[in-house]
């Protein structure tokens, strides 16, 4: 069924070719079907003529009345069906028109709301700026009047934006009045009084020529057109009357849309009431004649289709009747034609039913859409009405503020409160005009504005008083990220989760991160600081680490000992390369290891004369107290039993990652029995002990005026010292690898002598493996550096670069049973007659030359890690065991000292018993097959 819809609208013009083809295909099929029907009708007409001629011969008069009755009923049925179809089509058309008009109105209302929101926000910002002026003196007088006039102008512009289109004329009159009021208020008060006295009373009625009501903005949405629209409680009821006559010949007048002149007009015709919003101005201007002209072609086409349908139905019924009659006479030649006619009739009825169902579904969808748009229009109109009310109240408030009766009350606190009220009204207006999905955002903005209003409404003196009462400590509340003023190298590192708590002028920095190597790099120096000095340090800038240590020692007497005790510690200003000491330091796998940790008390006593014993075993990590008059201990075991790197190390000394003491699948019993250490103040006799390489003995140096700067900085660990050349690298193989053989190593180390007033040879043996540190007891002894690389492969000042990477196992004793019997002989020192209390050695001293007899202290085994106390007058001990029992690197090492990674003492699948015998200054192996003698002068030339 082709419907001519008149000129295409703009929406149909945008329809592409594919959609047009899809719409034309049903029309083409319908035209084909009409052609087939016409062909059949022509054939049936010929058949009916033939049958009629046949019937005349037999004069079947009894069927004449039946045929007429059938034709009359069929015509009535077809007329009713056609009327119903026309009614549905007209209703559908009206719904389409209504939907398009509602869409346009919705678009206009949404644009109006958007403009109103923008205007209200600008007004709110203007009032906020007026409320929070920096200089209160400028907020008075003429400047304030001008700003208030600008606010009134913005409010009037907002009212105009929120007003509907048909109220623009009324709003123009109101705007003229408001502008006049603003100009009058901005003028001096004397001029205003003079003008008011000249205004006639009749001028108040000039604006009463329109139908507007400033106090009733709800009625502003009524279109002044000729279509009947009834407003009852903001609901629009549009009555569309369709005039239709029951006669079939007068169907041309079926679609006339008549306007109802008043509410008392008769409703005799068929009417359809559609609840919809007001039509837009463009639709309302379309008259009824144009609509009738568009519908006339459709009506003519429908009439022609009805005639064709009626003829086809009549001929079909006639053919059926004739066919029934022909069955009596057995006209076999018409049998196929009759079946075809009956089949076509059934198909025609099914198609009509499907078309009716399709129209009904489309009509239902349009009804749902119309009701939805109606609800949305109602909500938008309500929001616009509330916005207009709020804007009018705000405008009145600003007008009252602009023209106060008493000018004295417009200043000071009263003016602030009035401006705050204006801001509140503006914010309420913004909230009213905002859509529902912006309520959360508007609430946040409203809270901020309310806070600003409260702050601005308070007196300025109260604000200053509150600012004075703010403590200075509140400035540090934002310090939630970790910063280290003493470590400038770490300033570029990412700051992860950091918690800094200020309690009792102490800083506790807890770095929370994963255990990966990358994140471990961020866990930089944890240095105890006294927060009372933070302000001075920030003013002075970054302090060098040495000065920082001295200042901490002078002011804080050993606040915390061994902060890096058995943990990983990195001193300040260490380069970023010394961050990968992440391996297990003491991993004891598949063995039975008994570790007893007994940490002795740490004391500082300036004047004590008695000896105090505090055991500090190697594996139990004990540290003995130092007792000496006037002894300044800079840092005691900062990196006790842990790998550490000190000031300004290069990037090459990173990967001390291997397990230092890996004792796998074995039971190791290390027993070191060290004889008593005797101290004398004056040595008269020469001693010529040997310091074996494998026993790791370091002879004490007893010289007057020796400054002991640091004692055992790299105690019993591999270390490298100042400015070592790069030639000493490839000692990466096993230095002393004794594989599948019985070896006897005898190493005789020459005496180490120094040329500062040597009187006697010194040399109580100090075994390497026992790691025993001899006490220096001598008046006015300044020992510069004792055992900087004690009991480890070491390289001294400016050694060649070929002696660096002692990375392999130093003493790998594999697949053999080695028995080391080492007996540490007595270490005797002769001095003058002060005899110290102690136990006397049961063994005979093979070196019997003594001038004074002294009791000796109880044995102090190396593996029990007992550190003898240093008792010397006027001994300045700068640093004791800074890197105690750990690998360490010192100032400006080259890049070649990297590979101290191997297991230092790996004893695999064997039972080893060590016993040291230091009588003759060499090691005696129970089973010896080979003797290798190494001179220290050969390996490490001075």
Swiss-Prot record:
InterPro entries with a match to the protein in the record: NBPF, Olduvai_dom
Keywords: Coiled coil, Cytoplasm, Repeat
Biased composition regions of type Basic residues, renumbered to the chain: 831-849
Predominant cellular place of this UniProt entry's protein: cytoplasm
Biased composition regions of type Basic and acidic residues, renumbered to the chain: 190-201
Tissue expression from the record: Expressed in the mammary gland.
Lineage: superkingdom: Eukaryota
Localization per record: Cytoplasm
Full protein name: NBPF family member NBPF8
Lineage: Eukaryota, Metazoa, Chordata, Craniata, Vertebrata
């Amino acid at each position: 069924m082709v419907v001519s819809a008149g000129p295409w609208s703009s929406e149909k013009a945008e329809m592409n070719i594919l959609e047009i083809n899809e719409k034309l295909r049903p029309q083409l099929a319908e035209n084909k079907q009409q052609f087939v029907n016409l062909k059949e009708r022509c054939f049936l007409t010929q058949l009916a003529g033939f049958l009629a001629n046949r019937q005349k011969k037999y004069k079947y008069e009894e069927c004449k009345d039946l045929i007429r009755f059938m034709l009359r009923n069929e015509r009535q049925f077809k007329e009713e069906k056609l009327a119903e179809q026309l009614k549905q089509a007209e209703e559908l058309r009206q719904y389409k028109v209504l939907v398009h008009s509602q869409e346009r109105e919705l678009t206009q209302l949404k644009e109006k709301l958007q403009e109103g929101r923008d205007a209200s926000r600008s007004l709110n910002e203007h009032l906020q700026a007026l409320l929070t002026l920096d200089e209160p003196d400028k907020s008075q007088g003429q400047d304030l009047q001008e700003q208030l006039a600008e606010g009134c102008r913005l409010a009037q512009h907002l009212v105009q934006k929120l007003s509907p289109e048909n109220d623009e004329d009324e709003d123009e009159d109101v705007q003229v009045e408001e502008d006049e009021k603003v100009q009058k208020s901005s003028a001096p008060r004397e001029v205003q009084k003079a003008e008011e006295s000249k205004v006639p009373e009749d001028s108040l009625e000039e604006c009463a020529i329109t139908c507007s009501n400033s106090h009733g903005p709800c009625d502003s949405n009524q279109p002044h057109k000729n279509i009947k629209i009834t407003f009852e409680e903001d609901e629009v009821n549009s009555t569309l009357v369709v005039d239709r006559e029951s006669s079939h010949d007068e169907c041309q007048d079926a679609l006339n849309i008549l306007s109802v002149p008043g509410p008392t007009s008769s409703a005799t015709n068929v009417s359809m009431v559609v609840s919809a919003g007001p039509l837009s101005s463009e639709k309302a201007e379309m008259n009824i004649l144009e609509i009738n002209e568009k519908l006339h072609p459709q009506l003519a086409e429908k009439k022609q289709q009805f005639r064709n349908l009626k003829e086809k139905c009549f001929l079909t019924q006639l053919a059926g009747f004739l066919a029934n009659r022909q069955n009596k006479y057995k006209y076999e030649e018409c049998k196929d034609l009759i079946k075809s006619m009956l089949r076509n009739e059934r198909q025609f009825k099914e198609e009509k039913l499907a078309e009716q169902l399709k129209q009904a579904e489309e009509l239902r969808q349009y009804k749902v859409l119309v009701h939805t748009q109606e609800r949305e229009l109602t909500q938008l109109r309500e929001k616009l009405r509330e916005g207009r009310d709020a804007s009018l109240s705000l405008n009145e408030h600003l007008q009252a503020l602009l023209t106060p009766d008493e000018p004295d009350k417009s200043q000071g606190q009263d003016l602030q409160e009035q401006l705050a009220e204006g801001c509140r009204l503006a914010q309420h207006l913004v909230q009213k005009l905002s859509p529902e999905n912006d309520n959360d955002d508007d609430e946040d903005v409203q809270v901020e504005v309310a806070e600003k209003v409260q702050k601005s409404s308070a007196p300025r003196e109260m604000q200053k008083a509150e600012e004075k009462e703010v403590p200075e400590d509140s400035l540090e509340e934002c310090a939630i990220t970790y910063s280290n003023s003493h470590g400038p190298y770490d300033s570029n590192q990412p700051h992860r989760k950091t918690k800094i708590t200020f309690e009792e002028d102490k800083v506790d920095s807890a770095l929370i991160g994963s255990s990966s190597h990358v994140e471990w790099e961020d866990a930089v120096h944890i240095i105890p600081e006294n927060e009372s000095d933070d302000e001075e340090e920030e003013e002075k800038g970054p302090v060098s680490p040495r000065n920082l240590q001295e200042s901490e020692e002078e002011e804080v007497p050993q606040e915390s000992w061994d902060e890096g005790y058995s943990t990983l510690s990195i001193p300040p200003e260490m380069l970023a390369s010394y961050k990968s000491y992440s391996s297990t330091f003491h991993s004891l796998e598949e063995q039975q290891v008994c570790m007893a940790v007994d940490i002795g008390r740490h004391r500082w006593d300036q004047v004590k004369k008695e000896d105090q014993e505090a055991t500090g075993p190697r594996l139990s990590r004990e540290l003995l107290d130092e007792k000496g008059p006037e002894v300044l201990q800079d840092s005691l075991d900062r990196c006790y039993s842990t790998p550490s790197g000190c000031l300004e190390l290069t990037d090459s000394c990173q990967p001390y990652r291997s397990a230092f003491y890996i004792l796998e699948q074995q039971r190791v019993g290390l027993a070191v029995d060290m004889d008593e250490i005797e101290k004398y103040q004056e040595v008269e006799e020469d001693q010529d002990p040997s310091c074996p390489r494998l026993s790791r003995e370091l002879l004490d140096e007893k010289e007057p005026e020796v400054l002991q700067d640091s004692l055992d900085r790299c105690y019993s660990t591999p270390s490298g010292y100042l400015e070592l050349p790069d030639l000493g690298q490839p000692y990466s193989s096993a230095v002393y690898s004794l594989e599948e053989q019985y070896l006897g190593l005898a190493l005789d180390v020459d005496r180490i002598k120094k040329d500062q007033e040597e009187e006697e040879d010194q040399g109580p043996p100090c075994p390497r493996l026992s790691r025993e540190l001899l006490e220096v007891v001598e008046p006015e002894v300044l020992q510069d550096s004792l055992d900087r690389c004690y009991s480890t492969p070491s390289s001294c000042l400016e050694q060649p670069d070929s002696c660096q990477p002692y990375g392999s196992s130093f003493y790998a004793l594999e697949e053999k049973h080695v028995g080391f019997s080492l007996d540490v002989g007595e270490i005797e020192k002769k001095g003058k007659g002060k005899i110290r209390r102690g136990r006397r050695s049961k063994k005979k001293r093979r070196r019997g030359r003594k001038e004074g007899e002294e009791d000796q202290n109880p044995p102090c085994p190396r593996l029990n890690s007992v550190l003898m106390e240093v008792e010397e007058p006027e001994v300045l001990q700068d640093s004791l065991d800074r890197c105690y029992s750990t690998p360490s690197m010192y100032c400006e090492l080259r890049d070649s000292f990297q590979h101290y990674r191997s297991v230092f003492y790996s004893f695999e699948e064997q039972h080893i018993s060590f016993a040291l015998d230091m009588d003759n200054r060499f090691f005696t192996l129970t089973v010896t097959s080979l003797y290798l003698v190494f001179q220290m002068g050969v390996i490490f030339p001075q």
